[in-house]
Amino acid sequence: MGAVWSALLVGGGLAGALFVWLLRGGPGDTGKDGDAEQEKDAPLGGAAIPGGHQSGSSGLSPGPSGQELVTKPEHLQESNGHLISKTKDLGKLQAASWRLQNPSREVCDNSREHVPSGQFPDTEAPATSETSNSRSYSEVSRNESLESPMGEWGFQKGQEISAKAATCFAEKLPSSNLLKNRAKEEMSLSDLNSQDRVDHEEWEMVPRHSSWGDVGVGGSLKAPVLNLNQGMDNGRSTLVEARGQQVHGKMERVAVMPAGSQQVSVRFQVHYVTSTDVQFIAVTGDHECLGRWNTYIPLHYNKDGFWSHSIFLPADTVVEWKFVLVENGGVTRWEECSNRFLETGHEDKVVHAWWGIH
């Protein structure tokens, strides 16, 4: 058993050594890798060194030529670093001279931060030869010539932004608001004056022989006889009242209110038993206070099936009206009779009627 264990240990050691050798590669590969590294280091030093691989050295032993390849690139890198420092110093001198020549454009440097970085030269890139340095200098001068119009554009844009900010600030000031309000008031006053002139001309066009109280159907009911002056006064008051409701806040143009324009309270009352809770009784008529047959005035339920509501109507006026049944916001039933007529007179009154019966 001891011999078996020793054989297994020896075999395992050999297998492990072979596995490690396969992972690291053969001894010939190291020479190739060293040559590849030397070839990569050669361009960094500038020009290739002649005879670098002509010394006859094999891949197993690099020899003294490999040491020369290692030391020379370091020397070239130092020289390149010296060249890089020179390019940095020259760039700083050019920037300082440009700022001294153009001191007024220092403000425009902030606007260059918003320009894409691809439009500015990268002067900190390492130069590998004097030819590349001369090219970088030409590119720097060309890009600086391009930067000058970009700086002017940023300066103009800054002026536009400042002008817009000044206008916004002026709009927020209370003095500008006062000026705007005064201008609006003057325009509204001029519009009111022009409308007053038009209304005065329309009043002059009203025929003097028209009577505003003659309302009736088939001569069955006649309005009280009015003289000419009363007819004109009533006509003008009715016209002014109608226009005053259409135009908001313009009732001040009525200088004198005639005595016939006073109002009386009329209480409409009817008995009707509705079938549902959503139904109610309303009144409508040809006068604007009654909805002009387009809308209705709801009546309030009292008790025992009675509905009533008080409405103000102009005195000495004949109106045509009727009760209606309303359900869900719409008229579902009208009185089964002809239209009713009412003479308002000069005193308050109560109009009690039965549904569908005159």
From Swiss-Prot:
PROSITE patterns: CBM20. Residues 1-6 are extracellular. This is Starch-binding domain-containing protein 1. Residues 50-66 have a biased composition (Low complexity). SUPFAM superfamilies: Starch-binding domain-like. Signal peptide: none annotated. InterPro entries: Carb-bd-like_fold (IPR013784), CBM20 (IPR002044), CBM20_genethonin_1 (IPR034838), Ig-like_fold (IPR013783). The chain crosses the membrane at residues 7-23. Its main location: membrane. CDD domains: CBM20_genethonin_1 (cd05813). Pfam families: CBM_20 (PF00686). Acts as a cargo receptor for glycogen. Delivers its cargo to an autophagic pathway called glycophagy, resulting in the transport of glycogen to lysosomes. Residues 30-42, 106-115 have a biased composition (Basic and acidic residues). Expressed at high level in skeletal and cardiac muscles. Moderately expressed in liver and placenta. No expression is found in pancreas, kidney or lung. Present in skeletal muscle, heart and placenta (at protein level). One of its GO terms (molecular function) is glycogen binding. Residues 126-140 have a biased composition (Polar residues). A motif (LIR) lies at residues 200-206. It comes from Homo sapiens (Human). GO terms for cellular component: endoplasmic reticulum; endoplasmic reticulum membrane; ficolin-1-rich granule membrane; membrane; perinuclear region of cytoplasm; phagophore assembly site membrane; plasma membrane; T-tubule. One of its GO terms (biological process) is glycophagy. Ubiquitinated, which leads to proteasomal degradation. Residues 258-357 form the CBM20 domain.
